Amino acid sequence: VTSQAIYNENPGKNAFQFHLPNIKTAILAKIGGIPWQLQTRKKSNDVIIGVGAFKSEKIGKRYIGSAFCFNNEGVFQNFDCYRDDDLDSLVGDIRKALGHFVIESGNPDRVIIHYYKTMKERDSAKITDMLYKLGFSIPVYIVTINKTEASDYVGFDTEDPGLMPKSGTIVRLSYNEFLLYNNARYDKPGRYDFLFPVKLKLKKVYNNAAPEDKELRMDEARALLNQVYKFSRMYWKSVKQQNLPITIKYPEMVAEIVPHFRKEELPAFGKTNLWFL
């Protein structure tokens, strides 16, 4: 049963009125509504997969959560949770998701994975091998999104009184490493809630392709970084902007709660519902 809990002492507090927009947003999302979505110019034929993790100090184990998106509007579904070392279950769910996608929309053009840490070669190989066995000859883009904000690099905008780079600013560190400034500074000075940028690493895997097609092009990198930026605006637990995309936030929230369930697994109802908001 979908529910929304409120501590009984909170409604009488003066500050409670400021929490109401967040509560209304979360309730609407939980019952299947769409508080807001991304405006897209063209329909994407991408399968987007988010993988986040949470380690419970009480339980002493790390769990990973996953979420799937079948469009570029930021509406996610098909959530699940696994043990940290159970990548085979994740690969199996990706295979099932691709099967449903093909039935509804035809063959995907790309698979994009937002991952909470650098994916090992043997782990990414399991995914690409699965695609090859299914007959897909499509590129796989792996976007490593560090949950910890990058503090080893500092950027300044000397034209801003607060020296904060404008939100959406991208700094290229190397061939495939970038900093994304994802704060609240737009055309006018705003509150600098997120002082440090998010560090991103991009990887393209395209088996059996021509050598030039295996290389990550800058236009592809920009599109992937723009997607990360936009998905950070799709957080429906609050009207406040986040610095991490929901491809990492939502699976992490699932991975934090599910280990406390009796069987440590997500029931069927919870796989298609934003109950965790």
Residue map of PLM features:
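Long, contiguous domain-sized segments
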Residues: V1-L277
